[in-house]
């Protein structure tokens, strides 16, 4: 039995996939709690799609793809904020227009220049094809994001929960706003090789959503989200070996299953406690 469980580790590509899934799962989990509490789930989705034209432009200009992706992600965030602040249109509407427009522009560029980057690898990642260089680059980005969150988490927490109070006590809310968006963009860049731009939104939302269902304490939510993200990501890679599937979609499906199971159990427990309390009220003394 143990030999069967350890069988995937005999292959270098599986070891690399497990390592990069571990690396990207930590910053994704930490950010996911802030995104869920702030109500920025759609912003993460928008930025993950918006990096596509940046990747193609970076290839055309001979720049690192990660650089183009990061710049495009930041541009999406800035453009969304500017349009929201200078029009009567709500933020979710602006995000829908900006990210769909940028994604479509990326597709037009991709078809026009026909780069030697496989479209599937951009959209869905190539976790089984990662190199040591990819892992090192991802570790640097993930380490930077994790460090910033570890140092400034209290400021980001107040910014996410009570924007007005953050302004009153003198926090630079604009810097916190764009700083958080820059970290989301960096994290999306880190996940590109692993899960691609389409599936990265799951890693940026699911861990925080599951953790918030389980606890109302912020620091515990951070720990739970990180643990859930690491376990689900690595389990997805390991499971994909035995079911002959791609690791990235397997990870996303596992996140969906865990979320549904958690929601079902929490709802059932709440309903059971409510019924028990009602019976206590109705029972004769």
Predicted features and spans:
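Membrane-interfacial amphipathic/re-entrant helices at transmembrane-helix boundaries
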Residues: 1-26, 274
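Loop-to-transmembrane alpha-helix initiation sites
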Residues: 17-20, 65-72, 92, 96, ...
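Short loop segments and helix-boundary regions at transmembrane helix junctions
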Residues: 33-115, 211-223, 240-242, 267-268
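Transmembrane alpha-helical segments in multi-pass inner-membrane proteins
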Residues: 198-249
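Cytosolic-side transmembrane-helix boundaries in multi-pass membrane proteins
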Residues: 245-285
């Amino acid at each position: 039995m143990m030999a069967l469980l350890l069988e995937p580790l005999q292959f270098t590509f599986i070891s690399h996939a497990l390592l990069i899934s571990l690396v990207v799962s930590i910053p994704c989990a930490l950010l996911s709690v802030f995104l869920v509490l702030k109500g920025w789930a759609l912003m993460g989705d928008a930025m993950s799609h918006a990096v596509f034209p940046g990747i193609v432009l970076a290839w055309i200009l001979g720049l690192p793809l990660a650089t183009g992706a990061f710049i495009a992600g930041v541009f999406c965030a800035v453009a969304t904020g500017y349009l929201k602040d200078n029009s009567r249109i709500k933020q979710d509407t602006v995000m829908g227009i900006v990210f769909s427009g940028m994604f479509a522009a990326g597709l037009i560029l991709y078809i026009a220049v026909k780069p030697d980057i496989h479209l599937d690898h951009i959209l869905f990642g190539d976790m089984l094809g990662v190199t040591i260089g990819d892992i090192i680059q991802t570790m640097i980005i993930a380490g930077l994001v994790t460090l910033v969150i570890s140092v400034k988490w209290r400021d980001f927490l107040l910014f996410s929960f009570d924007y007005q109070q953050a302004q009153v006590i003198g926090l630079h809310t604009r810097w916190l706003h764009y700083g958080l968006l820059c970290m989301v963009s960096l994290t999306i860049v880190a996940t590109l090789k692993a899960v691609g731009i389409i599936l990265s939104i799951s890693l940026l939302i699911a861990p925080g959503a599951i953790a918030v269902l389980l606890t109302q304490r912020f620091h515990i939510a951070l720990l739970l989200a990180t643990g859930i993200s690491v376990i689900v990501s690595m389990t997805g890679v390991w499971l994909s070996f035995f079911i002959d599937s791609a690791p990235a979609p397997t990870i996303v499906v596992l996140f969906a299953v865990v979320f549904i199971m958690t929601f079902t159990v929490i709802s059932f427990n709440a309903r059971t406690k409510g019924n028990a309390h009602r019976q206590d009220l109705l029972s004769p003394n």
